[in-house]
Amino acid sequence: MVSAVENMAANTTWASLGKATDLRNRILFTLALLIVYRLGTFIPVPGIDGAALRDFMENAGQGIGGMVSMFTGGALGRMGIFALGIMPYISASIIVQLMTSMVPSLEQLKKEGAQGQKKINQYTRYGTVALATVQAYGLAVSLESGDLVTEAGFYFRMTCLITLVGGTMFLMWLGEQITARGIGNGISLIIFVGIIAEVPAALAQFFASGRSGSISPAVIVGVIVMVIATIAFVVFMERALRKLHIQYPRRQVGMKVYDGGSSHLPIKVNPAGVIPAIFASSLLLLPVTISTFSGGSTSPVMSWLLANFGPGQPLYLLFFIAIIVFFAYFYTFNVSFKPDEVADNLKNQNGFVPGIRPGKKTAEYLEYVVNRVLVLGSMYLAAVCVLPEILRGQFAIPFYFGGTSVLIVVSVTMDTIQQVQSHLLAQQYEGLIEKSNLRGKGKTRKKRSPARK
């Protein structure tokens, strides 16, 4: 059955997109909302000194400024209304998901199905407002400390706070609308578009540095090879599977006995996808962002954070690896692959792993297999996210290039294409069903009652 579906998906061409009206509408809806997001990144927060901000971001572009600007689609560099990006929502999601594993009442809500999930989503929105408020106020104070505003004071702080919080909530709504009525995951697509939008400027800066002689031709070739190799490696690892053999017993229907079939349970090497990298980046970006915009007025704690937790610093890399590994395991076993639920589904379908008893023993075996697979998956995530950071520091590349960005772009692209193919496949199945129904009706019409004598 799986091979038949794969063959049909392979034979599905993009020419059939014109016939899939629902899919075409979803794609157009998604593109329209993403264009709205991009336009919003160019609307500035009131009270910002544009010239001072441009000078500041040119100096900060090589370090954390370039990293944050990449993740916000350049909105932070222009201090647009979407300067906080979607990161407060991601941070709130992290906190709520952690609490659902520790607080019994939230864990019970999680088990209540759609209604419980709706309540958890509401808590996530409340958390987003709270985090965005704290981050927006901290950013407003930091902008004042860095002499990047035209007129400092209470009015600017409140204006900045309301504008940035409103921008984040609007982005959250855009992401939810894309997920529900568009194609792909809305939050991931917003981050994806923000990264892609900054790539042309980064490439122009990179090649301009090569023409001026500040970067040697060998480094340019090395960076290009590294980017291509990283993309190929990410594609390979994201498609890598551990196939678990599943056996189905013989079954009797009436007087007929059907032989038991067999299939495979695909377990991805990286079941959590790009989520651990996004979570880790969102947690590490906040304190350093505030300390960066504070200029020379930072406290000793913020100065220490900026010195030790900037991209490429040893402590930054160690914490980055630790957070990625933690969320790779946490997100896999709490969201993307739950061994208990998978074991129950197999038991209900009379499927079993050869040599393993159905039920609890199967769940334990699945957990054992996924734990072993995740060792490779988490190492892959950490390597892709951290190695480009180390190489960028060694070769003094004058713009931000992170493996996290490449990972997000490749993973979101593959996921979106897969969803488009799924919609096209469903459209093809609907066409086959309609044709079979029409043929059935034609045959019934040909049958006439015998003429009376």
PLM regions and their residue ranges:
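N-terminal cationic and glycine-rich segments that engage phosphates or anionic surfaces
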Residues: 2-110, 115-453
